[in-house]
Curated annotation (Swiss-Prot):
High-level lineage: Bacteria, Pseudomonadati, Pseudomonadota, Gammaproteobacteria, Moraxellales
Keyword presence, 4Fe-4S: yes
Organism of derivation: Acinetobacter baumannii (strain AYE)
Biological processes, Gene Ontology terms: pyrroloquinoline quinone biosynthetic process
Keywords: 4Fe-4S, Iron, Iron-sulfur, Metal-binding, Oxidoreductase, PQQ biosynthesis, S-adenosyl-L-methionine
Cofactor, how bound (note): Binds 1 [4Fe-4S] cluster. The cluster is coordinated with 3 cysteines and an exchangeable S-adenosyl-L-methionine.
InterPro entries hit by this protein: 4Fe4S-binding_SPASM_dom, Aldolase_TIM, Elp3/MiaA/NifB-like_rSAM, MoaA_NifB_PqqE_Fe-S-bd_CS, PQQ_synth_PqqE_bac, PqqE-like, Radical_SAM_PqqE_MftC-like, rSAM
Gene name per UniProt: pqqE
Name used for this protein in its record: PqqA peptide cyclase
Length: 384
């Protein structure tokens, strides 16, 4: 099937599921500890070569923590030689001035650093790692020193949303060019911890108001910092155009070579191919996994006849699966969906107090307690 299928313009290389942090909102699979057979340097080179030949122009290095890979500089250099625009999506852990210098020499175009909170104690508690805030702060200084645009990402949830003003002040202190204030998206570990992470509607309204006030102040000062506020699906009435449509632009390769239309799709009961076994071209154009939700033939009648289907492409398939057990169902976020009550229930649950200590942290010991059939941890463990 090639007719009407666009080019895979954006390649996400999930280099590893390994990570020194333990964020309870990580979007990696719950059972990530089972997937250890990472692609080699040469195998990634081959993936980049094929993707570029197919028309891919942007390449994101993600994880886990991509800096865990000691061949990252080699991968960046190869991608740069091919003509990719390259973006490193990192926690900053494992970054040093020497590595930034080497990445700059290799041709890396862009670095995005994530924080957990503006307060060092809360930041390190959410990260499950001592001195994480200190490391991130110092790396932001070095990113500026090496003339990279300062792009910061904060995942916003009920445990840090009330400090949104302090978060923005920290970003201004670090001379950020772009700040993404992204309300938690509930996939992977975040979905497991949803009740303890989803902000209340009152919290959300206040945070958006404060963000808009800062935008006005910055505009009046002709300040270059751009604030991006990403509202969670759970407080919308229409679904997002997830990944700009299934298999339309985005091509994700997981650490073990599994090819996915989006990084969350691994959980779906669909057979996805592996780049070790099939060419990227065959995967993109011919595989069942990438063609499964293309077009509108798969849509239930209410979605297929909806005038918004060409805008939202039916919403998020992973969200439909997580909330209803069937990836073909109408996205529950949609107010027209017969499953919208699941979203309303989640909103109601957000009003229940939940402490930071109740969150299940993302680490190998917790991951090993999960299976594909039963995603329930036996006990929560925070690694020292």
């Amino acid at each position: 099937m090639t007719e009407g299928v666009g080019l895979p313009l954006w390649l996400l290389a999930e280099l590893t599921y390994r990570c020194p942090l333990q964020c309870p909102y990580c979007s990696n699979p719950l059972d990530y500890a089972q997937h250890k057979n990472e692609l080699t340097t040469q195998e990634w080179f081959d993936v980049f070569d094929q993707a570029r030949q197919m028309g891919a122009v942007q390449l994101g290095f993600s994880g886990g923590e991509p800096l865990v890979r000691q061949d990252l500089e080699q991968l960046v250099a190869h991608a740069h030689q091919l003509g990719f625009y390259t973006n490193l999506i990192t926690s900053g852990m494992g970054l040093t001035e020497q590595r930034i210098s080497h990445l700059k020499q290799a041709g890396l175009d862009h670095i995005q650093i994530s924080f957990q909170a503006s307060d060092p104690v809360v930041n390190d508690a959410l990260a499950g790692s001592k001195h994480a805030f200190e490391q991130k702060y110092e790396m932001c200084r070095l990113v500026k020193k090496y003339d990279y645009p300062m792009v910061l990402n904060f995942v916003i949830h009920r445990h840090n949303i009330d400090q949104i003003d302090k978060i923005i002040e920290l970003c201004l202190e670090l001379n950020a060019d772009t700040v993404e204030l992204a309300i938690c998206q509930f996939y992977g570990w975040a979905f497991l911890n949803r009740q303890g992470l989803l902000p209340t509607q009152e919290q959300l309204i206040r945070a958006e108001r404060i963000t808009n006030e800062y935008r006005e102040k910055l505009k009046a000062q002709n300040h270059p910092c751009k604030l991006i506020f990403v509202v969670p699906d759970y407080y919308e009435e229409r679904p997002k155009a997830c990944m700009n449509g299934w298999g339309k632009i985005f091509f994700t390769v997981a650490p073990d070579g599994m090819a996915l239309p989006c990084h969350a799709a691994r959980q779906l009961p669909i057979s996805f191919p592996n780049v070790r076994e099939q060419s990227l071209s065959r995967i993109w154009y011919e595989s069942t996994g990438f063609n499964h939700f293309r077009g509108d033939a798969w849509m239930p009648e209410g979605c297929r006849s909806c005038p918004d289907k060409d805008r939202d492409f039916g919403g998020c398939r992973c969200q439909a699966y997580m909330l209803t057990g069937n990836a073909s169902n109408a996205d529950p976020v949609c107010g027209k969906s017969p499953y919208h009550q699941f979203i309303e229930q989640a909103r109601a649950e957000s009003e229940i107090d939940s402490s930071l200590e109740k969150l299940v942290f993302r680490n190998s010991r917790n991951s090993k307690q999960f299976t594909v059939q039963q995603n329930i941890p036996v006990q929560n463990i925070v690694d020292d």
